[in-house]
Amino acid sequence: MSELTPDELALLRGVFDLARAGDADALAWHLDAGVPANLTNGQGDTLLILAAYHEHPDTVRALLERGADVTRTNLRGQNALTSATFKQDVETVRALLEAGADPDAGTPSARATAQHFDLPDMVKLFG
């Protein structure tokens, strides 16, 4: 396995920044050019987890359309649905649920997060 060059590392860091910033078009371009949709940083955060946490539903949808895995968790056991639930981002939660995210997956799960923080509107979304 070859190591990444400084330029390649900078490009990948930039891709994570696009997910955090919600630049769906630029992120989609990079994914279409070959960057993996399930790219993960050193904390285990995927592009999808970061986009969900930073409340970017269009970016979340762009990632889902390109194969991002809704079941992936970071090193703390958190997933994109838990992140969106914590932020009370209804649009992102709906997009993730429509893509098959399980509200009972992860540690803590999205459902447990909603219950812990007394977020009844989020709990209702889980059915």
Positions of predicted regions on the chain:
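Intrinsically disordered, low-complexity regulatory segments in ankyrin-centric signaling systems
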Residues: 1-33, 42-45, 127
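Ankyrin repeat start-site detector
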Residues: 10, 42-43, 75-76, 106-109
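Ankyrin repeat (ANK) core detector
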Residues: 13-16, 46-50, 79-82, 112
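Conserved ankyrin/ankyrin-like repeat signature
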Residues: 26, 58-59, 91-92, 121-122
